[in-house]
């Protein structure tokens, strides 16, 4: 799963990386949690790629209770084409979710107890971004307001991530962006082939402070490397 991530750096660099025609202003964030407003990238019909701020936590268009969104932060790539909550969005409403890095928690046995050690995962290119495969949905509230929401598609961990957690976000390569974003592309079979673990060489990992477990902790210190007693990479 992916329950926290970060997005920071000059907006000009993000616009260049994703070839955006327009993008709303956003602020650097180092501990983005579900139910936050997050930046996604879409490719509307007849236009170029655009950035849009939406809520993280998918509310399917048919949902009676918007509270379902709190449970739909992630969509397993293996079943995204068939699960009722996701299959419509997968076929017709896909997006990219840009990230400077993400967090995963490793279960560590210590003194007869199990604690969770967070790790920060960032692109091997220090100026790069990850592009998470994402889904979108628009839900109309009883008062007529339309709420647009998103979720992150996940996949099995690659070799680098496996010692930390069994799941990770599905990260797309630049040459896959257009097919994933194309609103006219309904070939779910071909789309499913894009969902898989990216190569370990594309990322770096480092342990960070458990302080990020709190959703109100924010700032560059969130991604600073800390010392740990034992590491699965030693």
Task: Give the predicted meaning of each segment.
Residues 1-234:
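Short linear sequence motif anchored by a di-proline
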């Amino acid at each position: 799963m992916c329950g926290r991530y970060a997005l920071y750096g000059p907006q000009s660099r993000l616009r260049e990386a994703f070839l955006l025609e327009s993008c709303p202003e956003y602020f650097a964030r180092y501990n983005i949690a579900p139910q936050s407003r997050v930046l996604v990238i879409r490719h509307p019909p007849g236009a170029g790629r655009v950035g849009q701020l939406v809520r993280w936590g998918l509310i399917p268009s048919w949902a009676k209770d918007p509270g379902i969104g709190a449970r739909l932060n992630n969509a397993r790539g293996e079943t995204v084409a068939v699960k009722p909550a996701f299959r419509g969005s997968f076929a017709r409403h896909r997006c990219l979710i840009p990230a400077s890095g993400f967090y995963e928690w490793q279960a560590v046995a210590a003194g007869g107890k199990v604690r969770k050690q967070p790790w920060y995962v960032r692109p091997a290119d220090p100026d790069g971004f990850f592009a998470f495969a994402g889904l979108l949905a628009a839900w109309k509230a009883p008062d007529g307001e339309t709420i647009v929401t998103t979720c992150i598609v996940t996949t099995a961990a690659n070799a680098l991530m496996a010692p930390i957690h069994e799941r990770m976000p599905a990260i797309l390569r630049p040459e896959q962006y257009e097919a994933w974003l194309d609103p006219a592309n309904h070939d779910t079979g071909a789309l499913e082939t894009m969902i898989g673990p990216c190569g370990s060489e594309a990322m770096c990992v480092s342990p960070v402070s458990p302080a990020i477990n709190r959703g109100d902790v924010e700032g560059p210190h969130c991604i600073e490397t800390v010392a740990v007693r034992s590491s699965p990479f030693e």
